[in-house]
Design a protein with these regions (language model features):
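N-terminal maturation segment of proteins
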Residues: 1-249
Length: 249
């Protein structure tokens, strides 16, 4: 929670200084525009109650903590030592995340049940025997055999962090997580802008999506008829799955 508050203060402080920034080169105009857009969006999201308590199966804290290891260099022994060191810090990072989730829970802010369930499944896979961190430790040991024991200890430390998070999600959040996924038009528009970097006409986009989906379904029905006269799309899928010529072994 303290980290989120500090980030919000910094964002507001930076926002108040942006208007006084004078671009020198043309590229600075682009940078300044992007900075204003992202900071402005963040301030709106923060005001709307967005925060680390929200989770999903792709881009939320549980995945970001794990995926940071994918971005770390793997060229020298020092690189591998840094990876081990970071594995030892996973528990600390996730403990802070648990505090954020708990503070939000006390305010009635809990992610939808569907999202909590999938993150429970993902985190269990992270600390399972032979999971991500065990594989990472093995990768370290293969690159620098002398670091094998340290890597194994780091993996166990990281797994413990995810084990604790998983327990918290199961015991505290899952029982009170709302079953409703819908967030409402206002929140959806902010999420949309966050991912797209621009504002779109939601009604027009939705109508376009429905039209495209209907076109796809119509084409699927045509192909299903070609595969077997009178076949439904589901029947055509079954026939294709059962076709030895289309199976990978």
């Amino acid at each position: 929670p303290a980290g989120e508050k500090a980030f919000a203060r910094l964002a507001n402080k930076t926002w108040n200084k942006v208007d006084n920034v004078l671009p020198i080169y043309d590229v600075d105009l682009v940078t300044l525009d992007a900075l204003q857009e992202r900071l402005g969006l963040y301030r709106k999201q923060h005001k709307a109650g967005f925060g680390g308590w929200q989770m999903n199966n792709i881009a939320s804290v549980p995945q970001e903590v794990r995926s940071v290891f994918d971005l770390m260099k793997r060229n020298t022994q020092q690189d591998w030592e840094h990876i081990i060191g970071r594995m030892h810090r996973v528990t600390e990072a996730l403990e802070g995340y648990i505090q954020t989730l708990e503070a939000a829970r006390e305010e009635g802010k809990v992610a939808p049940r569907r999202q909590v369930d999938i993150v429970i499944e993902q985190t269990a896979a992270y600390y399972a025997p032979g999971g991500f961190f065990d594989e990472l430790a093995a990768e370290v040991a293969e690159a620098v055999p002398s670091l094998k024991d340290e890597a194994a200890a780091g993996a166990e430390a990281a797994k413990e962090g995810y084990r604790r998070l998983n327990s918290y999600l199961v015991e505290k959040l899952q029982p009170v997580a709302p079953s409703r996924d819908a967030v409402g038009r206002k929140a959806y528009s902010l999420h949309s802008r966050s991912f797209l970097g621009t504002t779109i006409d939601l009604d027009e986009t939705y109508a376009w999506g429905v039209t495209e989906l209907e076109s796809i379904i119509a084409r699927q029905s045509e192909v299903a008829e070609e595969i077997e006269p009178g076949a439904s799309i589901e029947r055509a899928q079954q026939l294709l799955d059962e076709d030895p010529a289309r199976q990978l072994h």
